[in-house]
Amino acid sequence: YKDNILFSIGEYRQRFLAQKKDSFFGKIISINIKDKKFNMVSMGHRNPQGLVYIKKDDTILSTEHGPKGGDEVNKIEIGKNYGWPIASYGRHSDDKFREDSPLLKSHKKNGFVEPLKYFVPSIGISQIIEVPSRFGDDYNVFVTSMGKNLKFNKDKEPVGRTIYQLKFNSDYSKLR
């Protein structure tokens, strides 16, 4: 991803555009800063919140809001589909969407990439960052949530496993 800018675009209440290759909605995109060409990195995203490139592993990780639960941490793979609006561990807040978007629970069984980690109920997932080396070698990413949590992941463990969760007093903090 050298010389590239990565960014994400949510589906902006146009959920089926996340599955259309000719739309930017629901996608992670890269733009080469030298030749200005862009590429679709992945598709099938609902509402991406955080995006980080881990250079030492050549890995992209993202966080994404699900519908009424089903917030996700994803390992992004080039050309892969993450399932929205067909697969999610969340549920619709409005019954009128259930018929045309059944939200199948298994991503893998339906041909999509499974999240590394999902949260039901929702944690209001937000940013994901690589842990700076000055914090030591114990953790590789921090994931924040909209309220009281900061989740850490140990470097030697699978990214989807939360090793430690720090809870903040909700009177004083909202983490983004």
Label every PLM stretch briefly.
Residues K2, E11-L175:
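Beta-propeller domain segments
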